[in-house]
């Protein structure tokens, strides 16, 4: 009888759980509908989709509701998931942004296909050819039969070469610390997706390349933004970073030299950020693809010795191998293994012939792409200042990130420039910096001068 009673009790509990679950599903559907309506209202008044103050207020209400219930941690993670879903619903319902830098690039390519001449200053793509020895190694690998499936972490020789290069920063590394990836973008995705869970939080310092936040949101990870300003010379306030960290925070993303500002943090400030992460046992995801493009002293995050550091690198920038789609990540062995398992699921491995091309590139002397681009950047900066843009530095990378005069909107200026044959990147795509534009220095000096003539004409109100 006691067994039958227990079985009936179990059945009743399951029925109650089913009822609660179905009610949650109904409430989620209702909540998504409200999110869409809120998104429409925001668009009507020009309000941003992401509202940090509103999210903080809701978080406080949830914490108060959980007091004494013992479920605060789970409720907080669930709230992060719900916030992400609301942001995604509102973003998906919004008309596609016509002025993101990717949208500008795609439209510029379409115009070129129609026969229009476009000056490309919207993308950070070196215009030099890949190293000849890399192209030769690609062909040789195919001829030698290196065309089969490879292992997810990458070929051993390439991982050894990357480990040797990155060991100069003071942390001894082996191939077990390296995973070869489809460019740095995919390395960033692998790090976020494999090391964080839905409901976790990632701190991003803005202005920032949008892929950090995009990868996080696709993984169900809540993005907390720490905003920097031109007036502060793009240096983050350590107290603001500390305030942004919650019990759900698992990672801080940094990128120096920075895209889009070209900022290189002083060693002391970068160390302070990493120390904050170390005290909280957080991962530091350091995107260091612009390391060769520095006009001032630069330090890798690996120099800190923090044992939860992940560094991403790409041969796109260092060796002008953008179309090869190859890079790598440096991480503790356990984390590298987790990233490799996810890469195996997503794409098996980086194409083996491409890895042999990358190996040849890393073994040779670095090409002159960085040196050439930095010279162009030095020439672009005074032209941007003469056009009336306000900016700091830049200390490196390949961009000028400038505030437009007279409060002009970067998106509107970018569209008008494109109509006249110049593609530039609006600042809004890098974290809500609407009055800014990003100018890339990856073209020959005469081409950059022609592009700046177009920008000057637009800013002065002149005709086509």
Predicted regions and their residues:
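PLP-dependent class I/II
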Residues: 111-114, 125-126, 132-133, 138-141, ...
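N-terminal basic, amphipathic alpha-helical segments
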Residues: 64, 92-109, 114-136
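Domain-level signature for soluble enzymes in the chorismate/prephenate branch of the shikimate pathway
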Residues: 1-95
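Amphipathic alpha-helical segments within well-ordered protein domains
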Residues: 39, 60-67, 163, 340-343, ...
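Conserved N-terminal alpha-helix of the aminotransferase class I/II PLP-enzyme fold
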Residues: 149-181
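Aromatic/hydrophobic pocket-lining residues that form π-stacking "cages" and hydrophobic walls in ligand
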Residues: 38, 62, 82, 104, ...
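A glycine-/small-polar-enriched, mobile loop at the entrance of the PLP active site in fold-type I
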Residues: 119-127, 140-158
């Amino acid at each position: 009888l006691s067994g039958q009673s227990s079985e009936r009790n179990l059945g009743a509990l399951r029925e109650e759980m089913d009822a609660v679950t179905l009610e949650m599903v109904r409430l989620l559907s209702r909540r998504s509908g409200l999110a869409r309506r809120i998104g429409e209202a925001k668009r009507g008044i020009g309000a941003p989709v992401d509202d940090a103050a509103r999210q903080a207020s809701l978080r406080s209400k949830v914490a108060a509701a959980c007091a004494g219930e013992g479920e605060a941690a789970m409720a907080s993670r669930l709230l992060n998931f719900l916030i992400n879903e609301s942001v995604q619903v509102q973003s998906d319902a919004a008309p596609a942004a016509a002025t993101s830098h990717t949208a500008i690039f795609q439209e510029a390519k379409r115009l070129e296909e129609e026969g229009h001449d476009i000056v490309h200053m919207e993308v950070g793509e070196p215009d030099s050819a890949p190293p000849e020895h890399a192209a030769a190694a690609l062909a040789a690998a195919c001829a030698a039969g290196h065309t089969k499936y490879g292992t997810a972490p990458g070929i051993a020789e390439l991982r050894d070469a990357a480990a040797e290069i990155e060991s100069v920063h003071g942390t001894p590394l082996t191939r077990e610390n390296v995973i070869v990836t489809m460019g740095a973008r995919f390395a960033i995705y692998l790090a976020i997706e494999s090391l964080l869970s839905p409901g976790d939080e990632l701190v991003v310092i803005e202005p920032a390349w949008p892929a950090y936040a995009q990868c996080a949101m696709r993984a169900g990870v809540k993005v907390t933004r720490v905003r920097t300003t031109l007036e502060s010379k793009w240096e983050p306030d350590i107290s603001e970073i500390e305030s942004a960290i919650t019990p759900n925070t698992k990672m801080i993303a940094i990128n120096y030299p920075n895209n889009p500002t070209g900022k290189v943090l002083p060693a002391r400030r970068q160390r302070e950020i990493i120390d904050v992460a170390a005290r909280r046992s957080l991962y530091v995801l350091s995107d260091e693809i612009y390391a060769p493009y520095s006009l001032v002293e630069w330090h890798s995050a690996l120099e800190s010795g923090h044992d939860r550091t992940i560094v991403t690198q790409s041969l796109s920038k260092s060796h002008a191998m953008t179309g090869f789609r190859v890079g790598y990540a440096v991480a503790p062995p356990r984390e590298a293994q987790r990233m490799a398992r996810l890469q195996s699921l997503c794409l098996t491995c980086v194409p083996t012939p491409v890895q042999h091309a990358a190996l040849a590139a890393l073994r040779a002397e670095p090409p002159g792409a960085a040196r050439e681009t930095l010279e162009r950047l030095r020439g672009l900066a005074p032209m941007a200042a003469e056009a009336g843009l306000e900016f700091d530095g830049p200390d490196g990378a390949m961009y000028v990130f400038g505030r437009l005069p007279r409060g002009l909107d970067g998106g509107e200026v970018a569209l008008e420039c494109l109509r006249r044959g110049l593609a530039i990147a609006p600042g809004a795509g890098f974290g809500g910096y609407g009055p800014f534009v990003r100018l890339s220095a990856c073209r020959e000096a005469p081409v950059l001068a022609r592009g700046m003539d177009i920008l000057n004409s637009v800013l002065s109100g002149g005709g086509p």
